């Protein structure tokens, strides 16, 4: 759980932290000699605590990534298949045969544009209050997901940011999951435009009573009114 009540607590400073270093503490102005002394804790102590918290969350993170990057036989992602086939058709028309280019196209279109946004902003889907602590922690998880989808080699060293170092060991395995997901999508039976339209119509019928269109229209209007001068 990422609820503040489940975060590790520094018994001396009464501060919470999770998958990020408490840099906000270090940036605060000095108030007393004792408080200043508390802030001189070795970075290794913080790293140990971060690794401990990471271990607690590891199974949940693994399950999350597998849920995102897996295909259910009873409900294959037809829209993803149709769109990925479109990208492959565009690559073929333009004489692009480099598989890395297609990987980048697919990654930029779905994992990075959609899933990373959801990972960093769960309030878009769930009725929750995202605190600053949770926001920082979700950014670490989102970074791990981004690295998993990348094809570039991770260049890590002692000066690398903690959010990249924390999951460096798991990234190779996560990348295999991403590649397997793309391959499974590619091996699915292609859809015609008529089949895709029928699928979208069926999905619309399923949820036609789940949303308040008036509220949605009001939100769109407020958005348009706000940015109309621009």
Model-identified regions with their sequence ranges:
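Extended alpha-helical scaffold/tether regions of large eukaryotic proteins
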Residues: 1-230
């Amino acid at each position: 759980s990422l609820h503040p009540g489940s975060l590790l607590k520094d018994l001396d400073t009464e501060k919470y932290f999770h998958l990020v270093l408490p840099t906000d503490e270090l940036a605060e102005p000095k108030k007393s000699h004792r408080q200043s002394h508390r802030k001189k804790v070795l970075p290794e102590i913080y790293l140990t605590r971060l690794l401990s918290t990471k271990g607690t969350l590891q199974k949940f993170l693994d399950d999350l990534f597998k849920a995102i990057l897996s295909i259910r036989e009873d409900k294959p992602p037809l829209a993803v298949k149709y769109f990925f086939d479109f990208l492959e058709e565009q690559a073929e028309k333009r004489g692009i045969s480099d598989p890395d280019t297609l990987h980048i196209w697919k990654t930029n279109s779905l994992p990075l544009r959609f899933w990373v946004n959801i990972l960093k902003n769960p309030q878009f889907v769930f009725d929750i209050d995202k605190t600053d602590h949770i926001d920082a922690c979700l950014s670490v998880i989102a970074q791990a997901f981004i690295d998993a989808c990348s094809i570039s080699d991770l260049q890590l060293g002692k000066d690398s940011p903690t959010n990249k170092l924390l999951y460096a060991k798991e990234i190779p395995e996560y990348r295999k999951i991403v590649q397997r997901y793309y391959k499974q999508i590619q091996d699915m039976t292609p859809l015609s435009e008529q089949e895709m339209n029928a699928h979208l119509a069926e999905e619309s019928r399923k949820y036609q009573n789940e949303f308040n269109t008036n509220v949605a229209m009001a939100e769109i209007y407020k958005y348009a009114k706000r940015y109309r001068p621009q």
